[in-house]
């Protein structure tokens, strides 16, 4: 077992006694990105793993892209051919003492939270990257570590890709089940008719189509209010678009604003209400509310939907999920701009009027089926997380020398 010493750097920990450490600016050259000015076929990258457009300018590969800002800045990318990067990512070239692929693997395990700028959006400065300490084995050992990790990670990545694919298949299965049941019902084979609505297709011949607004009351939430109008106003918690998803309502701390007594009566969420997102990327998303310890209200990015009589709110929730996932909301809201699924648009959504008892049967059936599929998805996601953590821990062990390699195992 090799002798180890404390590196003096928190994220690195112990390193072999023959290794040293060095600041990144002595090992690599870090360059800013910029917006391209010409058209062409060169892929353009930001902080994400995929190019999002092409241009005429280029930088030569190989290079490593590291994030400047954004939720994925902690995920480095190795680019082997010509590329261009915009200002949400830095590109890195190696100096003579450092192997670029070894830097790529080090960047997987940097302590980003220690170096991040304290802003709303996660961000890293060029100076922070340049002043970061790196473990410095011999160039030969860097090659060996990078080559070993290439071989190991390619196998792990294959498992990760297969697991992600299985999760997507389960999600597709869930949507297929929802679509089939909310449009065809659960009472076996029966004559069908064309609904004349692209998003719905065929429905049972004896079942009419109506509009949501004829069967449900819809209340749009309150505009933001940053100050009380008089002494009767109180500061209350409210749901906003970020709180409402098909998976349910978020349990985190809620934002607050001022409500009058009349507004509290109008906008208070009740057990069993359907909350629907009015605007933004999640437009059309919805969830059924449950009782809370304290009253919670709605802001105007949310609508409360309640049955006028016999129509089932749980059935409507599944119908809306079906339509959202099939792209209906994108079309009626013109996704080219910021989508707004307004109260009028929700009221005009096609509503398949199954009998009261069949709506209940559909909701019960989908609750059971979706819960089973969701459990499988959760299990696969847990496995995915375990494998990702295993991969990261292996990378860390190798790049910091805690796990050794034979230096005869060299990269090409």
Which residues does each PLM region occupy?
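Amphipathic alpha-helical coiled-coil/heptad-repeat segments
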Residues: 1-12, 136-190, 352-412
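Periplasmic-binding protein-like
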Residues: 325-329
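A short glycine-rich beta-alpha junction/loop motif
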Residues: 4-7, 83-89, 120-143, 295-303, ...
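Non-catalytic DNA-recognition/assembly elements of restriction-modification systems
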Residues: 2-46, 139, 143, 194-223, ...
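Sequence-specific dsDNA recognition surfaces
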Residues: 6-9, 22-61, 75-80, 84-87, ...
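A short beta-sheet element
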Residues: 46-110, 117-120, 124-130, 240-241, ...
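Hydrophobic pocket-lining residues within nucleotide cofactor-binding pockets
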Residues: 129, 182, 244, 249, ...
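Short coil/turn segments at secondary-structure boundaries
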Residues: 37-42, 118-121, 190-195, 225-233, ...
């Amino acid at each position: 077992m090799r002798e180890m010493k404390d590196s003096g750097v928190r994220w690195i920990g112990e390193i072999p006694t023959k290794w040293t450490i060095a600041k990144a600016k002595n090992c690599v050259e870090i360059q800013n990105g910029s917006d391209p000015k010409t058209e062409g076929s060169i892929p353009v990258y930001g902080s994400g793993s995929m190019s999002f457009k092409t241009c005429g300018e280029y930088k030569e590969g190989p290079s490593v892209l590291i994030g400047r800002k954004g939720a994925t800045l902690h995920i480095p990318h190795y680019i082997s051919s010509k590329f261009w990067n915009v200002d949400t990512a830095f590109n890195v070239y190696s100096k003579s003492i450092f192997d670029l692929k070894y830097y790529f693997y080090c960047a997987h395990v940097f302590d980003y939270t220690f170096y991040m700028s304290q802003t709303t959006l996660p961000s890293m400065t060029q100076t922070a990257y340049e002043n970061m300490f790196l473990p410095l084995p011999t160039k030969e050992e860097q090659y060996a570590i990078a080559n070993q990790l290439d071989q190991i990670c390619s196998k792990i990545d294959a498992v990760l890709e297969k697991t992600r694919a299985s999760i997507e298949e389960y999600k597709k299965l869930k949507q297929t089940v929802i679509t089939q049941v909310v449009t065809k019902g659960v009472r076996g084979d029966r004559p069908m008719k064309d609904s004349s609505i692209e998003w719905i297709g065929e429905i049972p011949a004896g079942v009419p189509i109506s509009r949501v607004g004829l069967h449900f009351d819809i209340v749009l939430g309150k505009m933001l209010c940053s100050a009380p109008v008089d002494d009767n106003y109180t500061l209350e918690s409210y749901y906003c678009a970020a709180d409402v998803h098909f998976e349910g309502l978020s349990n985190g701390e809620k934002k607050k604003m001022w409500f009058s007594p009349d507004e509290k009566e109008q906008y208070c969420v009740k057990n069993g209400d359907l909350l629907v997102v009015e605007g933004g990327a999640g437009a059309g998303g919805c969830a059924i509310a449950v009782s809370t310890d304290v009253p919670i209200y709605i802001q105007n990015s949310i609508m409360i939907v309640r049955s006028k009589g016999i129509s089932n709110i749980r059935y409507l929730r599944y119908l809306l999920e079906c339509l959202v996932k099939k792209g209906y909301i994108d079309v009626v809201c013109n996704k080219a701009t910021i989508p707004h699924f307004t109260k009028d648009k929700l009221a005009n959504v096609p509503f398949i009027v199954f009998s009261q008892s069949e709506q209940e049967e559909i909701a019960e059936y989908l609750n059971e089926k979706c819960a089973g599929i969701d459990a499988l998805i959760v299990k696969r996601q847990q496995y995915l997380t375990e494998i990702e953590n295993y991969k990261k821990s292996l990378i860390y062990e190798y790049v910091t020398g805690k796990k050794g390699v034979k230096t005869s195992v060299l990269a090409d």
